[in-house]
From Swiss-Prot:
Annotated residues for binding of a beta-lactam: K67, S125, E161, T232
Classification lineage: Bacteria, Pseudomonadati, Pseudomonadota, Gammaproteobacteria, Enterobacterales
Database matches in InterPro entries: Beta-lactam/transpept-like, Beta-lactam_cat, Beta-lactam_class-A
UniProt name for this protein: Beta-lactamase GES-1
Inhibition and activation profile: Inhibited by the beta-lactamase-blocking agents clavulanic acid, tazobactam, sulbactam and tazobactam and the carbapenem, imipenem. Inhibition by imipenem may involve Gly-165.
Natural source organism: Klebsiella pneumoniae
Assembly notes: Monomer. May form dimers.
Amino acid sequence: MRFIHALLLAGIAHSAYASEKLTFKTDLEKLEREKAAQIGVAIVDPQGEIVAGHRMAQRFAMCSTFKFPLAALVFERIDSGTERGDRKLSYGPDMIVEWSPATERFLASGHMTVLEAAQAAVQLSDNGATNLLLREIGGPAAMTQYFRKIGDSVSRLDRKEPEMGDNTPGDLRDTTTPIAMARTVAKVLYGGALTSTSTHTIERWLIGNQTGDATLRAGFPKDWVVGEKTGTCANGGRNDIGFFKAQERDYAVAVYTTAPKLSAVERDELVASVGQVITQLILSTDK
């Protein structure tokens, strides 16, 4: 009798979980219709196992979300001894491109350290600092090689900033899929890709990101620990990737959206709405 009772409870739990995942899907489809948007979402656990998703295998432009794995590559080089965080990277005015606040601030000195550039790329989405790091690691091809090294066979970087943000429909360059990027996040933060010191630093940077207050974290409960890296590009691209801790469980998440008919503020609100849909799913399945 106890065995039958346990089976009944398991069946009820499975049915409830399936119902919540269906609600998750229908809520995202409703957002897509209302906003004339395409929304890609992947949520995985620390092992990279799928929790939920929508358009998980569809390619989207990475936009600036690649700056998080770029920073991870920089930390890997530091961990292995092939790079030093305090090494000064010299540059001139030619490194100043659109949206380079930290690069402009350090221009008078003629250099930034490796860690200063990496932090600016993650927390400010500084394009000049990003290109400076790409110069040092060997260009976009080296970034793609790192993706492959950590098990991501999908994500690719082909150009530097700002060209990589063109987001031309049908162009495979500089793209990823939600599931590929979510698993890359999980690999970096939970899979031992970096030393504990480097992992802690990059987590702290993501939590202190200055470009994402209106996106995913705006849709998550205030008591969740959230760290993320946003991305914005042409033709309505607005993205957010990172991690969150909810009810003592860790998750990696990737959200990619294309909404060319919306304003910049409305695109932020769209990503925040996706965060609310994710919240509903997590709270209902973690009971």
